[in-house]
Curated annotation (Swiss-Prot), chains A, B:
Lineage, top ranks: Bacteria, Bacillati, Cyanobacteriota, Cyanophyceae, Synechococcales
Role summary: Destabilizes orange carotenoid protein-R form (OCP-R), the FRP-OCP interaction accelerates the OCP-R to OCP-O conversion. Increases fluorescence recovery following non-photochemical quenching (NPQ) by OCP, most probably by destabilizing OCP-R binding to the phycobilisome core.
Disruption phenotype: Decreased fluorescence recovery after non-photochemical quenching (NPQ).
One Pfam short name: FRP
Gene (UniProt): frp
Keyword Lipid metabolism belongs to the record: no
Primary localisation category: membrane
Protein name: Fluorescence recovery protein
InterPro entries found in the cross-reference section: Fluoresc_Recovery_Reg, FRP
Keywords of this entry: Membrane, Thylakoid
GO cellular component, one term: plasma membrane-derived thylakoid membrane
Length: 109, 109
């Protein structure tokens, strides 16, 4: 993965980034849980149960890999979360302007 | 797997065996679906969602391997189904007595 060349991270930025990270993670899990419960309650065919199983397998794999909090990649993770609506642009204002711009630009790719 | 040495299978036995097989399979799937729906509706923690995922993975694997309808193994499969309560002894009366006895004996192992 490309390294970002933004300004060094302050301690406040790092702490707030981790807090927002956890928030997005919780939102994702809450959403997944709601989706699974809604889908499970509507299943009548076994094929749909296996489809739900496939969906869960894929999501678990995706979520396991997604929340990488190494500082070298966190800009990319936030861009992805912004793209997916798990983080809102207004929540990124604790970051220096160059980081916010970079995240927004990446999210549009 | 051991071969069974019971009397040859009549056409009627084979047909009824396959019908009972499908019935047991449907019972298993119905039971699994009910279990998953009940569990899913009670989940509040993500760990429990992953546990449900693990449970489904194991069940899918088990069910995929279990309903082996080759005549050489069907006695063993019925023994397993009997043991698990997916087939009742009274449902096996279409089979010659030696086959019923063998299934019941294997189910007690």
């Amino acid at each position: 993965m490309l390294q970002t060349a933004e300004a060094p991270w302050s301690q406040a930025e790092t702490q707030s980034a981790h807090a927002l990270f956890r928030k997005a993670y919780q939102r994702e899990l809450d959403g997944l849980l709601a989706t699974v419960q809604a889908q499970a309650s509507q299943i009548t065919q076994i094929d749909d149960l296996w489809k739900l199983h496939d969906f869960l397998s894929a999501k678990r794999h995706e979520i396991d890999g997604k929340y990488d909090d190494r500082q070298s990649v966190i800009i990319f993770v936030f861009a992805q979360l912004l793209k997916e609506g798990l983080v809102q642009a207004e929540e990124l204002t604790f970051l220096a302007a160059d980081k916010q711009s970079k995240i927004k630009a990446l999210a549009r790719l």
